[in-house]
Amino acid sequence: MNSFPWLTTIVVLPIFAGSLIFLFPHRGNKVIRWYTICISMIELLLMTYVFFYHFQPDDPLIQLVEDYKWINFFDFHWRLGIDGLSIGPILLTGFITTLATLAAWPVTRNSQLFHFLMLAMYSAQIGLFSSRDLLLFFIMWELELIPVYLLLSMWGGKKRLYSATKFILYTAGGSIFLLMGVLGVGLYGSNEPTLNLETLVNQSYPVALEIIFYIGFFIAFAVKLPIIPLHTWLPDTHGEAHYSTCMLLAGILLKMGAYGLVRINMELLPHAHSIFSPWLMIIGTMQIIYAASTSPGQRNLKKRIAYSSVSHMGFIIIGISSITDTGLNGAILQIISHGFIGAALFFLAGTSYDRIRLVYLDEMGGIAIPMPKIFTLFSSFSMASLALPGMSGFIAELIVFFGLITSQKYLLIPKLLITFGMAIGMILTPIYLLSMSRQMFYGYKLFNISNSSFFDSGPRELFVSTSIFLPVIGIGVYPDLVLSLSVEKVEAILSNYFYR
């Protein structure tokens, strides 16, 4: 137990430092950009320091616990703590947000507000991943939505208001169910609300009530980690948002749904989860095939990448519903891996849009000749996304496969059918990714504009892309980097499932 409140510092620092941006003089955007990047870097370094020196990965209990009484009236605490499950997403958040602030250099309009919103999002995400109180979890979940809505509706594309409204309707509608679930779980069986996650893990419910709670939480998380048919906000949002916002959306926002699914639905409601997991398995397989076959029909480049990320979320659902150590570890690895790969793909799509000002794939072509570096990076990340061995996507999907096959819960025929479905999805993934690459970079289309406006990626773009590419290769070569953090915690979660 540390005396210094490390986690509170990590959560509060970005939004506190971001609110100082408005005190800056209005002279230049450069000061604001450098200030934001420095804050993100300091935050990332602080995070790594704390987790290196004060976190033991082989301990499945909650560490770095902080508990301050906040509202005496109904026993509401500011309660933070991390374990092996939340440390991966927290570090991913720090990494991706730092690179997204670096990717937002071209933003000049209202840059004070833009960078403040980026930092506010940073705080809310880390608060969500480290909160140990259900109501605090809900507050951070809601605090996330406001910056995304503003970033969408102010710095988006042509149809930005439509997609921002769609986003806020979907996610706020999901949050209603989340709030009802939080209140139901907290108020069950006592006059005093118990919101502490530690005590709620040991709470047992009647099966019917547990199923109702499970459905409520599941709808809220299914909107965020888009599970079909609640996924339609995602392609619109990604098609319109500025690409630094897209990096945050694809890298972290989608992972909040998966994290909530593991943290609340698996830990708090194990009986209902083992009842629902066959259906989840079917939904995940359907989602892999559906999104992978919808993706080639999209003209918009960003929408195509968005559908590919919906398809990759199917592997996370299958890993979570396999109820094995291997499957859940693979799902966590896929969370981290897709966080890197999705963010990089959206970043490269955005930078190439900045170069050529074309969104639709059938208008592009032949870009590989003037822009070889972007072509190389885009091809590499496409390979990582279609699970080439040696990259992180391959090892994550392989571990999910193993988890499904070794699962005690399912019979042989369902396992074979689901494996067959996953294999169909894995065949469709190279089809849309390689056709996307072909339509963008190959071909003979000569542009009407003069070639003077084409310059290859500068040092900033190269730095962002390579610094995302290194962890992808690193996790692919040595996946224990991520797995060693979560493996003890996964065993602790699955020890509740004694009737697997």
Swiss-Prot record:
Q: May I have one GO cellular component term?
A: chloroplast thylakoid membrane
Q: Where in the cell is it found?
A: Plastid, Chloroplast thylakoid membrane
Report the InterPro entries cross-referenced here. Answer: NADH_Q_OxRdtase_chain4 (IPR022997), NADH_Q_OxRdtase_chainM/4 (IPR010227), NADH_UbQ_OxRdtase (IPR003918), ND/Mrp_TM (IPR001750)
Q: Which domain of life is it from?
A: Eukaryota
Q: Name one Pfam family in it.
A: Proton_antipo_M
What general EC class does the enzyme of this chain belong to? translocase
* Membrane-spanning parts: 4-24, 35-55, 87-107, 111-131, 134-154, 167-187, 208-228, 242-262, 272-292, 305-325, 330-350, 386-406, 416-436
Annotated membrane topology: Multi-pass membrane protein
**EC code:** 7.1.1.-
Q: Does the keyword Transmembrane helix apply?
A: yes
Could you mention a single GO BP entry for this protein? Answer: ATP synthesis coupled electron transport
Reaction(s) catalysed by this chain's protein: a plastoquinone + NADH + (n+1) H(+)(in) = a plastoquinol + NAD(+) + n H(+)(out); a plastoquinone + NADPH + (n+1) H(+)(in) = a plastoquinol + NADP(+) + n H(+)(out)
Q: Name one GO molecular function term.
A: ubiquinone binding
Q: Which UniProt keywords apply?
A: Chloroplast, Membrane, NAD, NADP, Plastid, Plastoquinone, Quinone, Thylakoid, Translocase, Transmembrane, Transmembrane helix
Q: Does the keyword S-adenosyl-L-methionine apply?
A: no
According to its UniProt record, which protein family does this protein belong to?
Answer: Belongs to the complex I subunit 4 family.
Q: What is this protein called?
A: NAD(P)H-quinone oxidoreductase chain 4, chloroplastic
Look up and give the organism this protein is from.
Spinacia oleracea (Spinach)
